[in-house]
């Protein structure tokens, strides 16, 4: 069985070969704020790996007469995928790349023996690493241009040994150019590759990739490009990803609360560098609390939030903390604990229960939470805010593991209250709100978290226990 796990090192190596250094694929800190919540493998990286697997055992060079590829599911780093040769009749081949029993990439192609009569103008250098373009809507509509072809032989042989031996170098360079086009040029920074269709065209003997936007539907973020390359012609279908969800500024939140409503609190906000934790930290600081917020990866986001609070007259500090491998030494003793630590909230495939996913949620919502409560209750912590979810009541099929883990967290809070009668735990079941965790390609208007969290914090304040 041909299986593969794409690592961050693999992604960086492919970015060097292709020139597609889009942070969605190579920067875990930036990618954590995408709708995927983590870096994902380049679609073309997966395509070229599958083609390399297919070419294993070949003895003669080939080239594509036609190639159709659909990138159906994102592939996260360290997720196992499987090569599946679905059919091979004469010179027509269909291959699927399978992730968690679903087709992630589907390719259908026709091939010919490569007579080696055309080699084109392919540079043997690595392409220059350029920052991906961030294009506005009108810039996308007008986008067109040319891309040079690159194929660095040593790197290509290391990453794709069979492709380097048996696929036309021009066609390998074209595939690499297609991912650079989408990830760096158009749509660029916020892109996601959806489909690639190429057909042999003997009349086109150009030396570069020529591209132009043929259609742009801003309602869905759909971009259709026409492409022409040496002896190839076709189309690319790509989408524009929604940007990270921005939250209300500290200055805009200050008028919503009394400036001394939470003045007695030394608030520790676990997971305060974005989303609900960010809003909570700002609301608490606006109401007079001294806030310490933690981050795991998003140091720059945490620094921005703390700077915003201090500049606005509030009190705030930050501390790095990985709740799964905690170093508690940088935390100050809180009077109030607000627990927003969370992994990527993803649903299970086809609504099938996933024990691994359930335990991954429990690591955050139960085990990590229990550890920090036990640590600070010994030092006098009395008040704990544990955000739960309405999914416990609604039980959506694809999020059973998430709801179960949150309900286990609620039960843990109840057990702690019995074990430690001096403590109070508040577990509001919050609705889905506008955060990085809930952005999607579909234009869904999730509610603003500010009024919902403000009400929850006020209710929590009414039930707190004095020291």
Where do the protein language model's features map onto the residues?
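Catalytic strand-loop segment that frames the active site of acyl-thioester-processing enzymes
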Residues: 1-39, 117-169
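HotDog/MaoC-like acyl-thioester-processing domains
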Residues: 1-5, 59, 64-138, 194-267
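Rossmann-fold cofactor-recognition segment
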Residues: 309-326
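C-terminal helical subdomain
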Residues: 240-242, 427-431, 435-467
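Conserved glycine-rich Rossmann-like NAD(P)H-binding loop of the short-chain dehydrogenase/reductase
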Residues: 289-304
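Active-site helix/loop of acyl-thioester processing domains in fatty-acid/polyketide metabolism
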Residues: 21, 32, 39-63, 155-197
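Catalytic loop of short-chain dehydrogenase/reductase
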Residues: 254, 342-420, 429-436, 442
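Conserved glycine-rich cofactor-binding loop
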Residues: 273-274
